[in-house]
């Protein structure tokens, strides 16, 4: 599996969560190109490839039901069929959808981290590169601050949601040591690859903090995609796979409480 547990801190890590940033046209061009390749390899209609193998449905603000009969989705597909330039049509359709710019249902935000209620007894973690001084939010010099963000977040969870909870996450960022060091080991130990082509935890790796495309990463991805002859292997074209993780909230209470009692930044000497 490409890129798992990679060291170092990539430049301009972007959001693992959806945010209100306006994404660049190149981000949509990339997904269209991927969908066209999927359609060729699989024999699927392009409409189905766009629904199942891109983030467009969510980016258009249509939720996560992925209903092929949704009126807005059908409007998009109708325009796509008639468009002289499918890339231009797709981006203009995105820009005129006000719901597409809306942030998810975040409960609370602490620095670069936030959380949302998932289902029942679950909360979901989100990360956004919120530092604005040009430094990486996941750099070693920010380790103490990121741990403080998470300690504050889980203090809020403990105070406002006293029932037993499961903490869940899904992101390409869990491949990176710079991100993994922020979380308890039992949580990381559950990491497993999930193949979900519809969601930002996969596609977000191609974006910087400003919503612009990472050109070098994108170029390498497209070169690998061009060489594929089977649908089974298209997921391997992505630089990083999405890892899903889950653990009891008590693991987080224990981990961040212990870090606060140790040296600054949660590191023992």
Cite the ranges covered by each PLM segment.
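Non-catalytic substrate-recognition and accessory regions of acyl/acetyltransferase enzymes
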Residues: 1-138, 156-168, 177-269
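Well-ordered, non-membrane alpha-helical segments in soluble/globular domains
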Residues: 137-156
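An acidic- and aromatic-residue-enriched active-site/binding cleft used to recognize and process polar
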Residues: 172-174
């Amino acid at each position: 599996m490409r890129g798992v547990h990679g060291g170092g801190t990539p430049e301009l890590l972007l959001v693992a969560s959806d945010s209100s940033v306006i994404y660049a046209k190149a981000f949509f061009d990339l997904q269209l190109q991927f969908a066209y390749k999927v359609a060729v390899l699989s024999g699927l209609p392009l409409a189905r490839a766009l629904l199942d193998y891109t983030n467009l449905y969510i980016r258009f603000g249509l939720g996560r039901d992925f209903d092929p009969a949704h009126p807005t989705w059908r409007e998009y597909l109708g325009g796509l069929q008639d468009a002289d330039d499918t890339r231009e049509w797709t981006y203009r359709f995105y820009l005129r959808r006000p719901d597409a710019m809306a942030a998810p249902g975040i409960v609370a935000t602490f620095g670069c981290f936030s959380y949302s209620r998932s289902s029942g007894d679950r909360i979901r973690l989100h990360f956004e590169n919120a530092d604005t001084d040009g430094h990486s939010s996941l750099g070693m010099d920010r380790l103490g601050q990121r741990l403080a963000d998470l300690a504050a977040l889980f203090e809020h969870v403990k105070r406002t949601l006293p029932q037993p909870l499961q903490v869940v996450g899904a992101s390409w960022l869990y491949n990176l040591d710079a991100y993994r060091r922020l979380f308890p080991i039992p949580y990381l130990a559950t990491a497993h690859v999930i193949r979900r082509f519809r969601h930002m935890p996969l596609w977000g790796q191609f974006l910087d903090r400003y919503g612009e495309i990472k050109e070098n990463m994108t170029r390498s991805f497209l070169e690998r995609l061009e060489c594929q002859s089977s649908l089974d292997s298209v997921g391997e074209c992505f630089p990083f796979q999405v890892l899903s993780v889950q653990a009891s909230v008590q693991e987080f209470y224990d981990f961040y409480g212990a870090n606060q009692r140790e040296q600054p930044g949660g590191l023992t000497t």
